[in-house]
Curated annotation (Swiss-Prot):
Species, as recorded: Klebsiella pneumoniae
GO molecular function terms noted in the UniProt entry: DNA binding; DNA-binding transcription factor activity
Gene: mauR
PANTHER family: HCA OPERON TRANSCRIPTIONAL ACTIVATOR HCAR (PTHR30346:SF0), TRANSCRIPTIONAL DUAL REGULATOR HCAR-RELATED (PTHR30346)
Annotated function: Transcriptional regulator of the mau genes for malonate utilization.
The keyword Transcription regulation belongs to this UniProt entry's keyword annotation: yes
Protein name: Malonate utilization transcriptional regulator
Pfam families: HTH_1 (PF00126), LysR_substrate (PF03466)
Length: 308
């Protein structure tokens, strides 16, 4: 399609023009649009040049619209209305601005972090609906990349998302502990050396979970492959198996408050100590999305509250 529209004709200038036609003079237009009178006059003058015919006539200090201006106004209203509908439809297809935010999270974050952030979000944007999806680190990241989620709360590595298409809001760091059945007679005052548990059975999260990666790394440092009885797809099932005496496991410290009476959590000895960095991640191209900006702000407030 051939484009014969002069580059001087912009949506911004059309907006100024429409406001001028409604207000009747430059001063009131400038006040309504929070612009200077000079900016309004320049916008109208360059728009007139772009259209290629007179739109106004000077009468004293006043600028009066000609019939051509009223004709242009009629079409401007149609164009702006059509463009607004087009932008709304575009955002809808992209999942933006529908009054709904699709958030993905690790299962372990539903105990405290996610509820607090959701409560804060409802205070900031009470009309916003929040859809929650739980899964592994890798599953949630794949869904974010496929635009099936708007933001995710996952474990991130330092520098992992540098120079990528994602923005990251760090929330907190969490230690990993050895989890043992409550019936085991262990000295909780001692740091847990994984080599002392080489003859024990373990339960683990499946591949793709953040804690699974730490599990593999810790036992690699310990120098042996643990006997894994079973792998599960959520951390609550893993804790239930530890409670039942099926085996030991490695758990993030954020589970401690809820399960410290049901399982024993021992701090790992120095060679095996590791920390998970929990962050909010979302696409950089959505950085100006008001809902995501609210989520990021709530995340920063949460981070400040627990890192004092």
């Amino acid at each position: 399609m051939k484009d014969d529209i002069n580059q001087e004709i912009t949506f911004r200038k059309l907006s100024v023009f429409m406001m001028f036609m409604a207000k009747g003079n430059i001063a009131r237009t400038a006040e309504a649009m929070k612009l200077s009178s000079v900016s309004v006059h320049r916008a109208l003058h360059t728009l007139e040049e772009g259209v290629g015919c007179p739109l106004f006539v000077h009468k004293g200090r006043n600028l009066l619209p000609l019939q051509a201006a009223w004709t242009l106004l009629e079409y401007c209203q149609d164009v702006i209305s059509l463009m607004n509908r087009g932008l709304e439809a575009t955002r809808k297809v992209a999942g933006v601005g529908q009054g709904r935010l699709r958030i993905g999270t690790l299962y372990s974050l539903t105990l405290e972090t996610v509820p607090r952030i959701i409560m804060g979000m409802k205070l900031r944007r009470p009309e916003l609906e929040l859809d929650l999806t739980m899964g592994s680190n890798q599953m949630l990241l794949d869904m974010l990349e496929d635009d099936a989620l708007d933001a995710i709360l996952i474990a991130t590595n330092e520098g992992e998302f540098n120079n990528t298409a994602f923005d990251v809001v760090p929330l907190f760091e969490d230690d990993i502990f050895l989890a043992a059945p409550a019936t085991e007679r262990l000295d909780a005052s001692r740091l847990a050396d994984l080599r002392d548990y080489a003859d024990r059975k373990f339960v683990s999260l499946a591949e793709g979970f953040a804690t699974y990666a730490g599990f593999r790394e810790a036992f690699h440092i310990a120098g042996f492959e643990p006997e894994i009885v079973t792998r599960v797809n959520d951390i609550f099932s893993m804790i239930s198996l530890v409670q039942a005496g099926v085996g030991f496991a490695l758990l993030p410290g954020r589970m401690k408050k809820v399960y410290e009476k049901d399982v024993q959590l021992l701090k790992l000895a120095e060679p095996y100590q590791m920390r998970q960095l929990i962050s909010i991640v979302y696409s950089h191209h959505r950085e100006r999305d008001a809902d995501l900006l609210a989520l990021a702000a709530e995340g920063r407030m949460y981070a400040r509250s627990i890192n004092r």
